[in-house]
């Protein structure tokens, strides 16, 4: 038979796995990675980022707003803008080389009517 302390450790680990989701926390943000913990938009310190809280939760996460998300193909998946988390790297749309190599300046509408955008990663293929 197992020693008692080994059995207790196994029971504790199995219980933590079952009730804790196996150590994997579900994502809060839909259009970016989860940013820092927050309660209000002010705590996120970025106009392109807001505090998203699931209903009934006292805390949320700083998330990139959908208009500033970086789409990844047509599968409704998104990449993080440069600098996020915690902050988004903004860029003047009129200057296409403002973002570092491997990134492009994307406005919230995806067109030239917006002056500022965010630096999104280029995806080839």
UniProtKB/Swiss-Prot annotation:
Is-annotated flag, keyword 4Fe-4S? no
Q: Which keywords annotate this record?
A: Glycoprotein, Secreted, Signal
What's the main place this protein lives?
secreted
Q: In which tissues is it expressed?
A: Expressed at highest levels in mantle, followed by adductor muscle. Found in the nacreous shell layer (at protein level).
Question: What does the entry list under GO cellular component?
Answer: extracellular region
This protein's source sits in the domain of life called: Eukaryota
* Compartments it resides in: Secreted
KW Transmembrane helix (keyword) present: no
Question: What does UniProt say on post-translational modification here?
Answer: Weakly glycosylated.
Q: Where is the signal peptide?
A: 1-16
Q: What is this protein called?
A: Upsalin
Give the species.
Answer: Unio pictorum (Painter's mussel)
């Amino acid at each position: 038979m197992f020693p008692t302390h080994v059995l207790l450790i196994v029971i504790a680990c199995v219980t933590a796995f079952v009730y804790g989701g196996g150590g994997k926390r579900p994502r809060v943000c839909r259009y970016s990675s989860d940013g820092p913990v927050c309660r209000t938009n002010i705590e996120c310190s970025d106009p392109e980022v807001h505090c998203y809280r699931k209903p009934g939760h006292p805390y949320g996460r700083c998330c990139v707003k959908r208009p500033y998300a970086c789409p990844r193909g047509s599968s409704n998946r998104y990449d993080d803008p440069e600098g996020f988390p915690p902050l988004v790297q903004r860029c003047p749309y009129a200057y296409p080389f403002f973002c570092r190599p491997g990134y492009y300046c994307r406005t919230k509408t995806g067109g030239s009517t917006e002056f500022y955008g965010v630096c999104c990663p280029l995806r080839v293929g």
